[in-house]
């Protein structure tokens, strides 16, 4: 996901905030089922109260200040899909953050997620459409929280890797449908075939404890976006389903999201044996 940022006021967003917003957008696009989200481009502008009022008047016939505006582009080029522009009044966001009792960054992130779903075609003109849009926002926020937690656990697990041969650290953490978390690191062996990948260690621990269904799996390693090997993908197939989220992370705000079918298409599983 490509995010371009334009600052047209005296607000200076931190690099962490921009990374978090980009991660929120990737999560929202995944929730919406957008294929190839890396090719999507979104423009984010921070503006003054005067500018957002002018935009609101010129494009929505409302001569009043507001907190955020969305301008869908829906333009596709050979290399990128331009989803649209998001414009946030940081002054209004700061006022709302004080009223609600949370930080400015948190308010800006929520406004950005809210606006993302406007770009994706959602609205809140009536109670039902408002409910549907709000559910999408909640789903995105909840998934981001799970990604944060599991990525942190996977990064911590990576430090426990036993890797005298490859010197390549991998950590994994999974959450079951009951909310239990199991973590693992790669454990190598002089007889290379006995080596166990981090994902396998986590899944074996889970299975031993009696859990059988994975809601989300996070994997992190020394390489840029360390993906599960073929054996791990097949083992994951035993305990995952179409709703399982696979997170391939460098850190908690730099990750890719996949479904099982994306990383293991045309797979063989228990149902093929009528189990």
Label the predicted regions.
Residues 1-109, 119-145:
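An acidic/histidine-cluster motif and surrounding catalytic segment
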Residues 22-26, 153-156, 198-205:
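Short, well-ordered amphipathic alpha-helical segments that serve as non-catalytic structural scaffolds
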Residues 149-163:
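Short, basic/aromatic recognition patches
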Residues 167-176:
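Short beta-strand scaffold segments in enzyme catalytic cores
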Residues 183-272:
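Zn2+-dependent cytidine deaminase-like catalytic core
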């Amino acid at each position: 996901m490509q995010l371009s940022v334009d600052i047209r006021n005296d607000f200076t967003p931190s690099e962490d905030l921009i990374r978090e917003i980009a991660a929120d957008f990737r999560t929202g696009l995944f929730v919406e089922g957008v294929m190839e989200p890396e090719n999507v481009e979104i423009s984010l502008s921070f503006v003054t109260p005067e500018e957002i009022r002018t935009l609101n008047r010129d494009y929505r016939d409302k001569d009043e200040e507001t907190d955020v505006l969305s301008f869908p582009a829906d333009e596709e080029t050979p290399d990128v899909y331009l989803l649209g522009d998001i414009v946030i009044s940081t002054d209004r966001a700061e006022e709302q953050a004080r009223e609600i009792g949370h930080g400015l960054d948190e308010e800006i992130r929520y406004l950005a997620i809210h606006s993302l779903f406007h770009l994706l075609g959602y609205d809140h003109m009536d109670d039902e459409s408002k409910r549907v849009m709000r559910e999408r926002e909640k789903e995105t926020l909840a998934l981001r929280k799970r990604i944060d937690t599991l990525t942190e656990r996977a990064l911590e697990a990576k430090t426990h890797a036993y890797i005298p041969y490859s010197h390549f650290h991998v950590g994994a953490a999974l959450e079951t449908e009951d909310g239990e978390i199991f973590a693992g690191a790669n454990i190598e062996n002089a007889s290379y075939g006995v080596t166990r990948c981090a994902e396998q260690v986590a899944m074996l621990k889970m299975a031993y404890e009696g859990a059988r269904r994975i809601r989300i799996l996070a994997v992190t390693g020394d390489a840029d976006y360390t993906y599960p090997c073929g054996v791990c993908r097949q083992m994951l197939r035993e305990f995952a389903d179409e709703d399982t989220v696979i997170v391939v992370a460098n850190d908690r705000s730099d990750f890719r999201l996949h479904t099982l079918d994306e990383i293991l298409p045309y797979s063989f599983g228990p149902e093929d044996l009528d189990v």
